[in-house]
Amino acid sequence: GRTVVNHLNQVFVDAVRATGGNNQYRFLMVCPYAANSTEPALAALEIPDDDRLIVSVHAYIPYGFALQNPGSDKWLASKPGCTSDIDTLAEVLDRLFISKGQAVIIGECGAMNRDNEEYRAQWAEYYFAKFKAIGIPCFWWDNGAFLSGETFGLFDRQLSQVRYPVLLEGMMKGASGETAAGSSAA
């Protein structure tokens, strides 16, 4: 598992760099086994020998709100049980990578639609602000699903419109760092 992924990460970096051209200057992303965001998986990640790498993790947390089906439709920043997974991941990523000068992104995140746009917006504002405070950009997983399955859809490609503008506003507030959540999330 993890040993194989660590080996493949180095093979990937070596292969891209060996092709020449601008590939010697490109930033490349590597991830732990399954892009897992747990501390054991992150601690087991061996960073390939290269100075232009970004660690990418996927983090749908807290699981009960973000991904579990069925799961909770409510999320409140005032409840430590709602924020603890986010706070812990930020601390772990900062300690293992950011504090050592290693770039990190949250390559996938999101909270499924449960007819709870306001709660999702509050979650997104807190989540994005928390990681913005330590220099980690977050990328919403917009899978285009609105009606069934893992409903992370945000932008309706058929109608060319944002389906959840309040959610998008929460993400943008958090990502800008110009929010009350940004100051309390740090």
Description of each model-found segment:
Residues G1-G81, E91-M112, A133-I136:
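Active-site region of glycoside hydrolase catalytic domains
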Residues G1-V5, S78-I86, N116, R120, ...:
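Residue-level preference for long, well-ordered alpha-helices that form the structural scaffold
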